Amino acid sequence: MNVVTQLRRRPTAETELPDSLPALLRRLYAQRGVRQMQELERSLRGLLDYRLLGGITQAVEVLRQALADNRRIVIVGDFDADGATSTALTVLALRSMGGREVQYLVPNRFEDGYGLSPEVVAQAAAKGAELIVTVDNGISSHAGVDDAHRRGIAVVVTDHHLPGETLPAAEAMINPNLSDCAFPSKALAGVGVAFYLMMALRANLRECGWFAERGLAEPNLAELLDLVALGTVADVVPLDANNRILISQGLSRIRAGKCRPGIRALLEVSNRDAAQLVASDLGFALGPRLNAAGRLDDMSVGVELLLCNDIVQARMLASDLDALNQSRREIEAGMQVEALHLCEQLERSRDTLPLGLAMYHPQWHQGVVGILASRIKERFHRPVIAFAPAGDGILKGSGRSIAGLHLRDALERLDTCHPGLMLKFGGHAMAAGLSLVEDRFDEFRQRFADLVGEWLDASQLEGVVWSDGELASPELTLGTAEMLREAGPWGQAFPEPTFDGRFRLLQQRLVGERHLKVMVEPLGGGPLLDGIAFNVDTLLWPDSSVREVELAYKLDVNEFRGKRSVQLLIEHLWPL
């Protein structure tokens, strides 16, 4: 099945941005909803005030008292990059503020599942926990919080996931997505919420003379912004103005060589130059290697990497993560072949694919089903949930959606209409996780397909490449590419600029197995440009009969043997 991919241009928008900005940047920012210069602020003074976060006063009080009483604090994280950075940041910050009894615990994806479950509480109790602080989880952990209380353990929940109808009975709860939280940004990642709590705690301790009385140097929390940037980008949260400040500051520290040894080691194994780092490198190079620990092994390896102060140890741990990531890629490649075979079987049985795909194979790896769902969604442009066996007749699924279908809302509707179909579920608009009994998979697959069929129509399943318009030939330069690189950070909901244009196709050849290397020239005349399109359909390309193409592309800086040149990163190409 070939999904039709259309080229559409972002609408132009009014702006109050000053003429001192280059016209191209004014246009690009306006197309992304930026109206005033203050929305482009990158300094820390532009951050939203931590006092606007609901529940932060209570959380600070619980933490301050725990530090004063020298209670044992256990940070309970999550097994993804956001959870790992949140955990490491909170441990480092609390220790720097005088916490002598600060430990951490990351649930094992395969043995414990997600969140603060009673099983995880038992592990925290075994560590002697007197206070549990959740990071990047906890907003739906009713049973875990209740179990902690039965054991005499207090709980502070910090999370950013969407809450359910009822909330756990924690001593304090911070989540910008709570209905009564007035914090203007709802886009903080888990590591962003943790950073805000640590800022508030430091301010409180400063005011009460904590550091002076104990002869402690007041910690510079800006030193942790490399972790904030990595976790925020890797979790693919919207890059609103507040998140762009956090990421810009973190990137600046990394570029200046002021990052933690663990991040430096991740840069080395992924062959990234710290001085030239951009936000997408965090998402596509560092994030996957950190995530590999939680997908295939235990995220404690990732947290230890972020915590360690010794570059030699960091390099060893980063090498382990790099090997895990390579294994993940191999597992994913095999699963993708099987998934495409399942899609072909579905097409043969009913002419067209369902608008919503639920897929299961008994040999799939539950740590990789989320990536698989993402790949299949990209290929067929429809909501996809992939399931893997989790033992004891239970399946765990991970879903990815497209614009127009809020995946968590869809699962909530299924749960309302068919109670008991799912054992549990949670997530966001574009991604969700769930579990169900294996015997009910076929029923779930049909009901999910029916629901998506009601909520979407076929026109919404067409792939769309959004363009910011054409670049004139004089703009197709290294200078423009470098300006765009520095104009970010770009990312989710603040996309890196994509342009379109018609070109004469002068050269085309495959590099690797599926990458198309080209040389093109604008039809109206202009510079000769190198370009590359990754993972092309090799049944279609290269095609020596094609002389002219329409391209959707990003203008990129290519570095080779110390020489910098402009290059087109081709998102899609259409023969003319």
Swiss-Prot record:
Gene Ontology molecular function terms on file: 5'-3' exonuclease activity; nucleic acid binding
| Keywords for this protein | Exonuclease, Hydrolase, Nuclease
Gene3D superfamilies xrefs:
3.10.310.30, 3.90.1640.30
Broad enzyme group: hydrolase
Q: GO annotations under biological process?
A: DNA recombination; DNA repair
Q: EC number(s) of the enzyme?
A: 3.1.-.-
Q: Name one Pfam family in it.
A: DHHA1
Family per UniProt? Belongs to the RecJ family.
Q: What exactly does this protein do?
A: Single-stranded-DNA-specific exonuclease. Required for many types of recombinational events, although the stringency of the requirement for RecJ appears to vary with the type of recombinational event monitored and the other recombination gene products which are available.
What is the name attached to this protein's record? Single-stranded-DNA-specific exonuclease RecJ
- The organism encoding this protein is Dickeya dadantii (strain 3937)
Which lineage is the organism of this entry classified under, starting from the top rank?
Bacteria, Pseudomonadati, Pseudomonadota, Gammaproteobacteria, Enterobacterales
